[in-house]
Structure formats: C-alpha cells, structure tokens
C-alpha cells in the first residue's frame, strides 16, 4: 500500500455539538473536498463511541462535557465528510474507541494498530481535536515505530488550544507536517 489516511474523530459533537473545536467544520469540509485528490489506498476513521455514563463526562467526575455517546446524533460522522468517504473506491475501516465505561481513551492505537499500516509507504494523519486525540494517536503510532511514515495534515487537524501542543509533538516525533494544499508538491 502506498498511502494510508487516518481521520481521527470527525464527529458532530466535535464540530457543532457539545465539545466543538474552533475551525472544525471548515477543516472537515476542506478534507472532504480533498479526499479524491489525496488518493489514499485505505482510509481509517477513528470514532469516540462512549457509553452513556462514561467516566470522562463531567456528570460522572470527568473533565469533558457529555459527547459522542454511541448511537447518538453527536457521534455521527460529519455529513460532507461521510458523503466523500462513501464516494471513494478504496477500503474504509471504522475504529471505535472510548467504549469502556471506566477508561478514557484519546488514541485508538494505544495497544495495537491496523497491521495494514506496516505496508504503507506513507501514513497521513488528521482529525479532531489536534491537541487531544490526533496528538495522542500520533504519539502511539510513533511509539509503535511508524513515525518515519507519518505526515500530519495540519489544516485538517484544528485544536482546542492554539495548535502549540500538536506542533510540539510533531517536532518531538520528527514526523512531517503539511497542509492539504501542499500535500503533493
């Protein structure tokens, strides 16, 4: 496989819902438009799929508002992006995380990762939020020895902060970063 694309948590609650990331709708629309040009051989989409009483939720002593409850509207993939994914001809895999009631999970790749990534020459990484789940996914993929293959799509990875935390991890892990516009230049 030449190119894999990982899209982290492009869900309604992180865009227009209970835990919105500034610039997320524009970033996910930009990504949806760029998907055909990205020409990925396989796409992996991670998704928060929390139980109703998840430990990360404020009413249960956590730090986050209730978000991405499995099967809720807020857990759905951003519609323009979902439509663009459906139009692709490559395989698409959805990876749920945060499913355990008493365990928060900021990365879908803590313990394992899709073995298809080993054969990828390039792994593009983007999604929401840049300073939380994209950052932790990057750290875990790098820990699994995949850093040399990773390129972070910075304009498709908006953060709850000003982007500083993600940029710091990009530097630490020595992965590449690029905007969608400059991807194949």
Predicted features by range, described:
Residues 2-6, 13, 26-42, 51-53, ...:
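Active-site-adjacent betaalpha module
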Residues 48:
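Active-site loop/turn elements of alpha/beta-hydrolase fold enzymes
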Residues 57-61:
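Glycine-rich loop at the start of a catalytic domain that most often binds anionic cofactors/ligands
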Residues 15-23:
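Acidic/histidine-rich helix-loop elements
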């Amino acid at each position: 496989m030449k190119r894999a694309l990982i899209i982290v948590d492009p869900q309604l609650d992180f865009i227009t819902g209970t835990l919105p990331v500034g610039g997320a709708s524009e970033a996910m629309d930009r990504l949806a438009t760029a998907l055909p040009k990205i020409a990925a051989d396989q796409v992996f989409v991670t998704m928060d799929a929390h139980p109703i009483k998840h430990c990360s939720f404020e009413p249960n002593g956590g730090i986050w508002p209730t978000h991405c409850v499995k099967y809720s509207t807020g857990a759905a993939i951003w519609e323009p992006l979902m439509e663009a994914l459906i139009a692709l001809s490559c395989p698409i895999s959805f990876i749920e995380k945060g499913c355990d009631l008493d365990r928060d999970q900021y990365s879908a790749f803590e313990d394992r990762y899709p073995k298809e990534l080993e054969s990828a020459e390039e792994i593009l990484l983007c999604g929401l939020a840049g300073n939380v789940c994209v950052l932790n996914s990057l750290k875990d993929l790098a820990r699994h020895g995949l850093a040399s293959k990773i390129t972070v799509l910075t304009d498709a990875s908006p953060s709850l902060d000003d982007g500083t935390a993600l940029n710091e991890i990009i530097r630490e892990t020595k992965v590449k970063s690029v905007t969608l516009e400059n991807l194949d230049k």
